[in-house]
C-alpha cells in the first residue's frame, strides 16, 4: 500500500484508471477487475518523464496529460508537463525568456479545442496544439499569466492574485478560470488579458471550479464556495459554514453531479450534493460512518470522478 501522500491525482480512460503516486510514478488499474495492470516509472521502457506526478487529465483529443514537479533546468522542455498519445511521450516546451521564469511545478492541467492549460508556480500557462496537417508540428507555449502589474506576461506581471496557480479550467470561448493560493482570475486567452480578479481574504491550498449556466462556483479551503455571475459580472453571496449549504468552510473538491443542475462539494464536512437551481442540499454525508448512508474515509476528499453509476 501507499499511505500519507500529499496528493494522488486520478484520470479514467475507458477501462483503465491512471493513479498518480508522487515519488513513484503512475499506477494503471483495470477499472472493471481492480487488478493492477502496470506501474509507469522513469526506468520503464515507456520512459515517463518524472515520477513526482502532481496532476493527471485526459485531454481534448484523448491523450493523457501529466504534470509533475521537476528541477528548474532551464532546458527548452524540462519535463514538467508531458503528453502520452498512446505510444509516445511529448514534452511540452517550458522555456520563457528572462531569469527564473520557467514553470517547473505543475499543479493542475486541462484542455479544450484551443489548447492545453496548466496551473504552475509561474502562473497560468497555455500551449497551442500542434498543426494536425503538419506531422513535424510541435506544441508551442502561448503565454504564462502571473502576478504583478507590469504587463507582458512571461514573468513580467499580468495582475493575477498570485503566481502560484493551483487550478485551471476553460469556462467558455476564449475564457480560462485560474484559481490561485490568494484568489482567482478569469483570463481572456484570445487577447492575453486578465479580465476579472477576485482576491481571497485568506490563503488557500485548493481552488476548485464548476460552471453551471451563467454562474461560476469556486471552491476554496478556508472560504467555502464563492459564486460569480458571468452575465452581470458580479459576485453573488458565498456559501460557507454560516449559510446552511455547507457545514464547514474548507472545500477541497467540486464536481458536476449526475443530474443536470446538481453539484457535489467535498471537504472537511465530507460530501454534499447541492441543487444549484433551488440552492438546496439534496444529500449530505459526513466523513466516517453515516446512518443510512455510505462510510466515507476520515480524510477530506482530494479528487472525485463519476463513471457511469460509480463515484
Can you annotate each of these PLM segments?
Residues 1-13, 43-57, 61, 93-111, ...:
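Short coil-to-beta transitions that initiate beta-strands within beta-rich domains
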Residues 1-27, 31-38:
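An edge-strand/N-cap motif at the start of beta-rich repeat modules
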Residues 16-19, 63-65, 115-118, 175-178, ...:
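Conserved beta-propeller blade signature
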Residues 22, 69-71, 76, 121, ...:
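Short loop/turn segments immediately following the C-termini of beta-strands
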Residues 24-28, 78-82, 123-125, 183-185, ...:
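A short loop-to-beta-strand structural motif that recurs across blades of beta-propeller domains
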Residues 30-34, 84-88, 129-133, 188-192, ...:
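Short loop/turn segments that connect beta-strands within beta-propeller blades
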Residues 37-38, 90-92, 142, 195, ...:
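A structural motif specific to WD40 beta-propellers
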Amino acid at each position: 500500500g501507499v499511505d500519507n501522500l500529499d496528493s494522488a491525482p486520478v484520470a479514467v480512460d475507458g477501462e483503465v484508471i491512471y493513479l498518480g503516486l508522487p515519488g513513484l510514478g503512475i499506477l494503471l488499474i483495470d477499472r472493471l477487475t481492480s487488478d493492477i495492470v502496470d506501474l509507469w516509472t522513469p526506468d520503464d521502457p515507456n520512459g515517463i518523464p518524472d515520477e513526482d506526478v502532481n496532476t493527471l487529465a485526459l485531454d481534448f483529443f484523448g491523450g493523457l496529460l501529466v504534470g509533475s514537479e521537476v528541477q528548474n533546468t532551464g532546458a527548452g522542455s524540462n519535463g514538467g508537463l508531458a503528453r502520452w498519445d498512446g505510444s509516445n511521450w511529448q514534452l511540452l516546451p517550458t522555456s520563457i525568456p528572462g531569469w527564473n521564469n520557467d514553470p517547473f511545478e505543475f499543479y493542475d492541467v486541462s484542455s479544450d479545442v484551443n489548447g492545453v492549460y496548466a496551473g504552475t508556480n509561474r502562473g497560468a500557462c497555455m500551449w497551442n496544439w500542434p498543426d494536425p496537417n503538419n506531422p513535424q508540428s510541435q506544441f508551442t507555449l502561448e503565454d504564462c499569466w502571473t502576478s504583478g502589474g507590469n504587463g507582458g506576461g512571461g514573468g513580467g506581471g499580468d495582475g493575477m492574485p498570485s503566481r502560484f496557480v493551483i487550478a485551471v479550467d476553460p469556462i467558455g470561448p476564449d475564457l480560462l478560470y485560474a484559481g490561485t493560493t490568494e484568489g482567482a482570475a478569469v483570463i481572456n486567452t484570445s487577447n492575453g488579458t486578465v479580465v476579472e480578479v477576485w482576491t481571497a481574504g485568506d490563503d488557500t491550498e485548493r481552488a476548485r471550479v464548476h460552471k453551471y449556466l451563467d454562474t461560476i462556483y469556486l471552491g476554496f479551503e478556508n472560504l467555502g464556495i464563492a459564486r460569480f455571475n458571468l452575465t452581470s459580472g458580479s459576485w453573488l453571496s458565498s456559501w460557507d459554514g454560516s449559510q446552511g449549504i455547507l457545514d464547514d468552510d474548507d472545500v477541497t473538491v467540486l464536481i458536476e453531479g449526475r443530474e443536470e443542475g446538481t453539484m457535489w462539494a467535498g471537504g472537511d464536512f465530507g460530501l454534499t450534493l447541492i441543487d444549484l437551481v433551488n440552492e438546496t442540499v439534496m444529500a449530505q454525508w459526513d466523513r466516517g460512518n453515516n446512518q443510512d448512508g455510505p462510510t466515507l474515509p476520515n480524510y477530506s476528499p482530494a479528487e472525485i470522478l463519476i463513471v457511469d453509476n460509480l463515484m
